[in-house]
Amino acid sequence: MGDYGFGVLVQSNTGNKSAFPVRFHPHLQPPHHHQNATPNPAAFINNNTAANGSSAGSAWLFPAPATHNIQDEILGSEKAKSQQQEQQDPLEKQQLSPSPGQEAGILPETEKAKAEENPGDSSSENSNGKEKLRIESPVLTGFDYQEATGLGTSTQPLTSSASSLTGFSNWSAAIAPSSSTIINEDASFFHQGGVPGASANNGALLFQNFPHHVSPGFGGSFSPQIGPLSQHHPHHPHFQHHHSQHQQQRRSPASPHPPPFTHRSAAFNQLPHLANNLNKPPSPWSSYQSPSPTPSSSWSPGGGGYGGWGASQGRDHRRGLNGGITPLNSISPLKKNFASNHIQLQKYARPSSAFAPKSWMEDSLNRADNIFPFPERPRTFDMHSLESSLIDIMRAENDSIKGRLNYSYPGSDSSLLINARTYGRRRGQSSLFPMEDGFLDDGRGDQPLHSGLGSPHCFTHQNGERVERYSRKVFVGGLPPDIDEDEITASFRRFGPLIVDWPHKAESKSYFPPKGYAFLLFQDESSVQALIDACIEEDGKLYLCVSSPTIKDKPVQIRPWNLSDSDFVMDGSQPLDPRKTIFVGGVPRPLRAVELAMIMDRLYGGVCYAGIDTDPELKYPKGAGRVAFSNQQSYIAAISARFVQLQHGEIDKRVEVKPYVLDDQLCDECQGARCGGKFAPFFCANVTCLQYYCEYCWAAIHSRAGREFHKPLVKEGGDRPRHISFRWN
């Protein structure tokens, strides 16, 4: 028998038929054809489409019954080229305006897979569209030639899907609208026209294939080279979307973004913090700037998390006048990077002049705590983040700067209406906002600032007199065990005259603080502010290095009391009723009014005011507080509990709750008729009474059945409440 080969029958519009051999790629050849494939030159065979949209002919594989030699192959090849040149002009016109039959020839990947398994079925289903055989080309050796489905022509590979080998390819082609010239083997695949001249030159452009996550700047599902081509096909937007779902996104070599390193991807994926940074789009606040920014890459979305603030990109929250000051250290607010807890004093230069005014900008650059990370905030707005948020509340009656600040705190359904000053508690800062500089992130940071803002040495003046902001009593904790009173005095004497005190100092007759802490009683409030300026701030706490005979430069904690932390108004629209106020005993001294108010509001709701009792001379907390409710139900629920667990930060203490007893109330029964108009000495805290009684009315009312076991509450003279220095708006 003679030799058998395979040929392709091509039928054109003129009716001429020519058969010439075709050699298939080993990956794309059916299993039963491997032995019979002849090593002939590769060619691309395009089937023409009739004018009515139906297929004028099909390309089928058939066994050639007659033998042939090399001369027959040469003659057939030249004849095919001449026929293709004659058909080139009408073919280009037909490809520029695809017919509905061509649109219907686009199949999803699942149908392509079925077409590979059943060649006969796929050929019958694609009878309405153009067909092209994907054949090995010597020019494309080493490249996985990938056709752009829906770009220019709607061709369908009959043997294998092109996307099955894209993982091993680094190059792909961007097909121009007219691709019929690819059959010319002597045509070059690299044109000098570039992307803008692709349609004019009728050539193919080769671009590197990159993973979709490497080029986030282009955004969406459109690659760079698809954009120019899409201008020639505005009536087929679904082609590009369909094409982008089944093929990898392409990257132009001219793209400003760096190419990926595929050989490092495995190592990066093993490190979670590095793998996440590779897969996320760059933050608009990052240090890398694209040389040719596009609208889609200028504001690419960042990751989640504090994000709105850019925490994952190492964005520094400290901002200058116009947000353009580069920080000394870009420290993540959610990560600490200290090797030890020891603080070296030589890193921080103390100010030469304690009261020399300087600009807030200079102070922010020279601040000692600029090297330390920001205070750790496990929750965005909890009580720890409100440490210096509400400043000088109810003490700003004559201050010219007042504002209504809306702030939502955890567990609340409405925002807080706070009548507060706009400057911070210390160093001109306030942690009401995540940014420590206290400026709103809405463009208002450029407006003129108050003279008391920004510098730790600038004090607020009222009617020519300086307003006190701190108590003259300061807590000092973590003292060296061998330090005595004289050494403590010598360590803090440079800030001003002071007296060292600690609990039970007179009874103990000891020169050493028994529990490692003491109180500094300064003569002037300005000494406290000078002490604060000399401290080091870390995690929201102040430290100062103190030396003893055996320990040198030991950091001790400095805990001043801000006078604005004594009162907090949560709801200024509600009237303050003493009959709906509770007394909280045993309040830890670090707890502030804002924290006490939020704890009680979370437990019982309806809190409109909270206050910390302070001594009238030094204005330091005495260990008790008051909470006023806006409704009777919350008030009764609080006094019925009798005990409350105060939990905040390092504070976890069980405190007692009682009705707040006043000593200037008349008897609710006789209105002073039986007692001669004297104030009622007794108050019944039982929920069935909740009234003030004189001695006569108490005996008469509580002699009844069921009330004989009620116990009166007596307000002692020493616990007389101080005047509340605020007024309702």
From Swiss-Prot:
<dbReference type="InterPro" id="IPR034819">
    <property type="entry name" value="CPEB"/>
</dbReference>
<feature type="binding site">
    <location>
        <position position="697"/>
    </location>
    <ligand>
        <name>Zn(2+) 1</name>
    </ligand>
</feature>
<keyword id="KW-0966">Cell projection</keyword>
<feature type="compositionally biased region" description="Basic residues">
    <location>
        <begin position="24"/>
        <end position="35"/>
    </location>
</feature>
<dbReference type="InterPro" id="IPR032296">
    <property type="entry name" value="CEBP_ZZ"/>
</dbReference>
<feature type="compositionally biased region" description="Low complexity">
    <location>
        <begin position="285"/>
        <end position="300"/>
    </location>
</feature>
<keyword id="KW-0479">Metal-binding</keyword>
<feature type="domain" description="RRM 2">
    <location>
        <begin position="580"/>
        <end position="662"/>
    </location>
</feature>
<dbReference type="GO" id="GO:0030426">
    <property type="term" value="C:growth cone"/>
</dbReference>
<dbReference type="Pfam" id="PF16366">
    <property type="entry name" value="CEBP_ZZ"/>
</dbReference>
<feature type="binding site">
    <location>
        <position position="675"/>
    </location>
    <ligand>
        <name>Zn(2+) 1</name>
    </ligand>
</feature>
<feature type="region of interest" description="RNA-binding">
    <location>
        <begin position="541"/>
        <end position="543"/>
    </location>
</feature>
<comment type="subunit">
    <text>Interacts with TOB1.</text>
</comment>
<feature type="compositionally biased region" description="Basic residues">
    <location>
        <begin position="232"/>
        <end position="249"/>
    </location>
</feature>
<feature type="binding site">
    <location>
        <position position="702"/>
    </location>
    <ligand>
        <name>Zn(2+) 2</name>
    </ligand>
</feature>
<dbReference type="GO" id="GO:0042149">
    <property type="term" value="P:cellular response to glucose starvation"/>
</dbReference>
<feature type="binding site">
    <location>
        <position position="684"/>
    </location>
    <ligand>
        <name>Zn(2+) 2</name>
    </ligand>
</feature>
<dbReference type="GO" id="GO:0046872">
    <property type="term" value="F:metal ion binding"/>
</dbReference>
<dbReference type="GO" id="GO:0005634">
    <property type="term" value="C:nucleus"/>
</dbReference>
<dbReference type="GO" id="GO:0030425">
    <property type="term" value="C:dendrite"/>
</dbReference>
<keyword id="KW-0770">Synapse</keyword>
<feature type="modified residue" description="Phosphothreonine">
    <location>
        <position position="326"/>
    </location>
</feature>
<feature type="compositionally biased region" description="Low complexity">
    <location>
        <begin position="83"/>
        <end position="96"/>
    </location>
</feature>
<feature type="binding site">
    <location>
        <position position="689"/>
    </location>
    <ligand>
        <name>Zn(2+) 2</name>
    </ligand>
</feature>
<feature type="modified residue" description="Phosphoserine">
    <location>
        <position position="252"/>
    </location>
</feature>
<dbReference type="InterPro" id="IPR000504">
    <property type="entry name" value="RRM_dom"/>
</dbReference>
<feature type="binding site">
    <location>
        <position position="694"/>
    </location>
    <ligand>
        <name>Zn(2+) 1</name>
    </ligand>
</feature>
<dbReference type="InterPro" id="IPR012677">
    <property type="entry name" value="Nucleotide-bd_a/b_plait_sf"/>
</dbReference>
<dbReference type="GO" id="GO:0045182">
    <property type="term" value="F:translation regulator activity"/>
</dbReference>
<comment type="function">
    <text>Sequence-specific RNA-binding protein that binds to the cytoplasmic polyadenylation element (CPE), an uridine-rich sequence element (consensus sequence 5'-UUUUUAU-3') within the mRNA 3'-UTR. RNA binding results in a clear conformational change analogous to the Venus fly trap mechanism. Regulates activation of unfolded protein response (UPR) in the process of adaptation to ER stress in liver, by maintaining translation of CPE-regulated mRNAs in conditions in which global protein synthesis is inhibited.</text>
</comment>
<dbReference type="GO" id="GO:0035235">
    <property type="term" value="P:ionotropic glutamate receptor signaling pathway"/>
</dbReference>
<dbReference type="GO" id="GO:0043197">
    <property type="term" value="C:dendritic spine"/>
</dbReference>
<keyword id="KW-0597">Phosphoprotein</keyword>
<dbReference type="GO" id="GO:0003730">
    <property type="term" value="F:mRNA 3'-UTR binding"/>
</dbReference>
<feature type="modified residue" description="Phosphoserine">
    <location>
        <position position="332"/>
    </location>
</feature>
<keyword id="KW-0256">Endoplasmic reticulum</keyword>
<feature type="modified residue" description="Phosphoserine">
    <location>
        <position position="255"/>
    </location>
</feature>
<feature type="binding site">
    <location>
        <position position="710"/>
    </location>
    <ligand>
        <name>Zn(2+) 2</name>
    </ligand>
</feature>
<dbReference type="GO" id="GO:0005783">
    <property type="term" value="C:endoplasmic reticulum"/>
</dbReference>
<feature type="site" description="Important for the positionning of RRM1 relative to RRM2">
    <location>
        <position position="561"/>
    </location>
</feature>
<feature type="region of interest" description="Disordered">
    <location>
        <begin position="218"/>
        <end position="324"/>
    </location>
</feature>
<dbReference type="GO" id="GO:0014069">
    <property type="term" value="C:postsynaptic density"/>
</dbReference>
